[in-house]
Structure formats: C-alpha cells, structure tokens
Amino acid sequence: MPFFHNRAALLAGALLATSACGGNGAVPSNAVAGNPSLRVGVPQERAISPDDNTSILKKLKKDVVIGSTVDPTNGDTGPRSIARVTISYGKLKKGQLAVCDFADASGTPGNGTSVDVLDPTPGSKPTTFVQSSKIQGCDGNALSSANNTYAAGLTSHVVVKYDQNGKYVKTYGTPINAPMTSGDAFCGQPYAPEDIYVGDSKDGGITKFAAGLYGNPRPVEVITGFGVNNGSGWGVLGPSGIRYNGTRHGSLCNDTLYIADGVDNTIVAISKASNLLTTGEIQVKPGGKTFKCKQKRFTCATLVYSGSPLNAPVALALLPNGNLVAANTQGGNRLVEISASGKLLATKSVDKSSIAHVFGLLAIGSNDGNTVLFYTDTKDNSVHELEP
C-alpha cells in the first residue's frame, strides 16, 4: 500500500475507533498532535509552485459581460464570490458559474440570501440555486467535487452545506464567527482529503473541516491571527480570497493554500495545507508578515507579497500557470498579478471608479494561451470575463 494510502487508512481506523468510543466520529485534535501518523495529507510535489514570470493579466485585453447576477426570484444584488462547476451532477452543469449575492434587492449589503447559477457565455441569464436566510450576507460559495455548495453568510454567522440540487444538508457554526469567504481544497486523488476553508472577519482565523470521507468533519480553527478591521458592509476586511493549488504531476500534488489579507495588504501561502489539523497550528504574528508554525515539518506559512500595489485586497484568483491575481477594494478597482514567489508582474484597472466593485475572481484555462479571468462587478451586478 502506498504511503499516502496507508496514512489515510490509519486515519479511517482512528475515526472508527473514536466513533465506537465517543460516538462523534471525529479525531480529537490532541490525538492527531500526539500521533503524527494520523495526519491525512497528500504527497506533495513541492511546497510552492515553480516560479512563472509570464504575465497573463497583460494578455487579457478584452472585457466581456457574461450576464446579470440579479436573482430572478427576490432581486438580490451585489455579486460577491464566484465558483465554477467542474462536473455535471444534480441541477448543476459542468462549466457553469455560481455566484453569491451579498446585497438584497434594495442594494443593502449583508442582506443577500441567494446563490445564483449562470452559463459562462455572453447573454446568460441567472437561475436561483439556493435562497435562504441561513446564508444572509452571502459572501462565499465553495463548490466541492461532488457539487455540494458551502455557502458563507457574513450576517448569519455560519456556513451552510447544500447538496447538488440546492437542498439543505448541514450548518457549520462555532468556531466560525463572521465568515467572509469559503474555499474548496482537493487534489482529486483516491483517498485524498477534500477540505473546506473559511476565513473569519471577526477573529482573523481560518477554519477547516472535511468535505469528504477523510479528515475531520468538525470545524477546527487551524490558523489564527490574520488582521481584521471590524468594518461593515462592503468595507469588511480580513482573511479572504482563499485559493488552493491542487495541480498534480502524476501522483504528486502541489497542496498549497493561498490567502489574501486585506488589512495588512499581504498574500500568504500555506504549504502542505492538507496537513493542517489542530487548533492554532499556524499563528500569524501582528503585521501579517511573520508566522509561528507548531509543526513545521508538516505545514507552515510563508509571505508571498506585501505592500503596494496591494490595497485592501479581498478577492484572489489562482491562474493555471501558478500566478495569483488579487483585486483591490481601495484606491480604485485594480487587479494585481503576482508570481508564486512574490514577483510583481502586472496591474490592470477594470473600472475607473474609486468605489470598490470587484469582490470575486476566478481563473480558468489549461495554458497561458487559453486562460481567462472572470470577475464579479457590483456596479452593474454582473459577471465579466477578461479574455485575450
């Protein structure tokens, strides 16, 4: 049995044993810390992506409106996060775009309760996938490999799981306080863990829980200390823009998690993210540029980039070549492209307005020539596509 499969089997055995003794089916965090063999991870290619100095943002000259994100049922507005459907299953079709509405029909931020779906072609019309007060202030809609949606509600203070047909499954609360993003992490390998990460704008933490069969199904705040600004509405800042690099080469996976810190104007990389399991395993020190890692041999954080031209970034996109694009929410609607090693590659303003309008980013493609970048625009309540 390969090393990774053996570790997965060990955790599965631990889950069964814990369930038999305690009835909750979860591995206690102290048990994992005391026995490193219980950690479920993926075989890593390397901690950080190979550096690529090719700017994709410079190639994206054309801005195309894909379609409105105004919910057809209740008129919710203010498109926030954006995710792509990767398989056709249930009501969702491969290639479709799912968008969270943060505002209601009157434009009041924090009152939106909808997740809408639209096709990735110009002229698309949105359809309501989920609508519930459970996700009030919807600002995150991570999509799992099984088309489960994990919608984050900033105002409702929880993350809610919905199945492939938009039916309610489960609510995730404490230690989640004020979720401002949710992201899925999966390498697509047999026995590999699939996890959901949630950024919290109240305490600056990152909470993790398993979306699949392997790992801990209970929420654990694995990272603490990111900056928060105690803002309101569109001005809330904290750890956000969560993106996972699950690029595979054979049986090896990159396994790097990226987080934008809008308070400290940084982008942070978490190596071997699948190994994050215990409470406070990584602590972000004041200023957001240095870190304390309890188990460095398993996982740790590094600073990718800090300072100008980053200016209160909220959204983050991971490009196919490993570069990152962040969207500023102060000083204009500027996109900033940075390599995985922290080299500034390009900037691009998509709106001359001084008011922030871009809160969601998503890149798709397989190479430098066919990469496109979707962004949500709260000015016209639509999804745009930047293409060559």
Q: What is each residue range found by the language model?
A:
Residues 72-94, 131-149, 154, 174-196, ...:
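Beta-rich, blade/repeat-based domains predominating
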Residues 108-146:
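Blade-loop segments of beta-propeller domains
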Residues 22-29:
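Bacterial lipoprotein signal-peptidase II cleavage site
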Residues 50-75, 123-136, 164-177, 218-234, ...:
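Surface-exposed loop and turn segments in beta-propeller and other repeat-based domains
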Residues 118-123, 163-167, 210-215, 272-275, ...:
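Short loop/turn segments that connect beta-strands within beta-propeller blades
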Residues 102-104, 153-155, 164, 200-202, ...:
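Short loop/turn segments immediately following the C-termini of beta-strands
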Residues 17-20:
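C-terminal motif of bacterial Sec signal peptides marking the signal peptidase cleavage site
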Residues 107, 115, 157-159, 204-206, ...:
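Structural signal for beta-propeller blades
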